[in-house]
Amino acid sequence: MLERLSQITSHTRASTAPVADHPLDPLSAAEIKAAAAIVKAAYPDKNLTFNVISLADPRKSEFLAWSAAPEKTSVPAREVDIVALEAGVSGVWEGLLDLTAGKVLSFELVTGVQPILTIDDLSKVERVIRSVPSVIEQCVISGISADEMDKVYCDPWTIGYDERFGTERRLQQAIMYYRSDEDDSQYSHPLDFCPIFDTETLEVIAIDIPNVRRPVSKAKHANFHAKAVEELGGYRTDVKPIIVQQPEGVSFKVSGREIEWQNFKLHVGFNYREGIVLNNITYNDHGEVRPLFYRISLAEMVVPYGCPDHPHQRKHAFDLGEYGGGYMTNSLALGCDCKGVIHYMDAAFPDRNGEPITVKNAICIHEEDDGVLFKHSDFRDNYATSVLARGVKLIISQIFTAANYEYMVYWIFHMDGTIQLEIKLTGILNTYAINDGEETGGFGTRVYPGVIAHNHQHLFSLRINPMIDGVENSIQMVDAAVSAAPVGSKENFYGNAFFPKATVFKTVNDAITDYEGATSRSWDMINPKKIHPYSGKPASYKLVSHETPLLLPKEGSLVWKRAGFARHTVHVTPYVDRQFYPAGKYVPQTSGEPSRGLPEWIGDGTGNIENTDVVLWHTFGLTHFPAPEDFPIMPAEPMSLLLRPRNFFLQNPALDVPPSYIMTTSGAKKLGESVVVESLTDKVSRLAFGETSAEKLAESSCCSK
Ligand code: ABN
Ligand code: CU
């Protein structure tokens, strides 16, 4: 039970708060410091450590009022979410500060919950367990000598939930490995036991030991460092460099954290949990600035593993809610994580003492070639009449490391008004020990001698607060449907009639829906009051998403209960300020009884979601049956979804993108065989082989016929 003990509210001091550029900006390092100082001054007698000091998003109505008339409206107050721990006290201190006023608005102890694990919390486990006698004993049983404990490593995971230990203590499970050399990849040498670690007392409180023992593998480590590749024959020598050139720099403008690019304008937020947050996205449609989305972010994810043997049921990481997509974010390297001309944004987080830590280059913003945007040629004059425009895309990205896995998150803006989310998975499989000849049971794949990688899913929750031409929107599900009229009937004589069947959701219950590939199902975020003059249909952005596996853990299972958001592809709820976390605010060690987050907000499902401010929660991802090709390090596996304008623009909004080649029929007749449209020519592309004379190049160029 979540028990709230109301404590002190409203402690005031003179404000010395630094001023932010924009109400949606994440807290700066100076603001984090100032927020920590307010808390420390208010509660000098408490021995507090900080878990979260993060912007509490402004209330939407206040933000929109300010944004519509910034000169006339006061800036929304900077409010700050605090999660702090007090030594020896179970539960978390949850605070809300008004940073502008230098004031504590609320500070209360929430019991029966556990906060996110920070990198600091994770780092303790390995350091401590190496000298714990019961762990050393298990290592020796596994075939590692007691004086080799510096070669023993662990990936610390939150325990998830284990009914033996409940939620009282802050627990981590140590997923154990061995390296014969510090440069080894430990994942080819998993150990078969799992210590349970108390994060606060630094004690190992239990060790899960399997009935069948699996000594540490005697195989060579499966490494991916240069020496290992050398032993396999060395790096390939036939890869020629590809250099990205942007001689005139970038096509986007940056003002603070606001980006303008190709008619789009948006604010790039970032927080410890969701990582990148895209705020207040608008599109300048020939002078009319049209709102598209108020806020889009990755709100949660769950990675359930499919091996039924204890304790593997505990492997179902909520990487955002339990560890934080911001806290785990990488500092990105120029020419490496992103190529071309890059603009970076840093991220600032608190350490346990409330001192700011800055992650340099946490967000990468850059452009890439986007292939052909549109093309048509007329066969009548041997394709001389032709147009071809190439696209450019804007990419806002981050990469976070969730212990073994890397998640690469790309928010991509296209010139036709489409917004895409692409996530690529790389890094290393979570592995476990398997004896020679031992059956996998089908629940995993032997990816290397002595190594099994269990089946699992990566299910993400995308939170979309649409604002299609205004705050009042509806959601409709669209299915390809065939005419009900039989073949031979007047209405469908040839039997070929089909059409898009749109179902507008009225209530929260209506909107609980799953993907249906056979009907090309999609979901439109519509403004029912904005009707397109040609199509007669409402202005919309369509969610096109096909990688939508169902949650495989069964109804009633621990994962099903804890990850309520993942039970369906789409949920829609009425908008509520600061309702961000679909598996609950405090995810570690929730039992799922009751299911937190979305299931609570759904309630009896009768809430109105028609023609109002709504939030669409979309579950997407993939089911991963590991293969040896995923090991020892996984080639990046992409998944992608689109938000596409439909009945929103009068016509193709990218018609004004300068084409690489354009020729009319009359122009082709007049100019004859060889035409170069000088100003648009790509001067860098050239033939790979053979003739390189100027004439030959011109003949094969897209700019000549
Ligand atoms: N994938 C589970 C996890 C994530 C981050 C840190 C530790 C473990
Ligand atoms: Cu995977």
Regions found by a protein language model. Give the residues of each.
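Extended effector regions of multi-domain proteins
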Residues: L2-T12, L99-V104, E108-L117, V140-I141, ...
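Hydrophobic or amphipathic alpha-helical targeting/insertion segments
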Residues: V89-S90, G95-S123, R127, S131
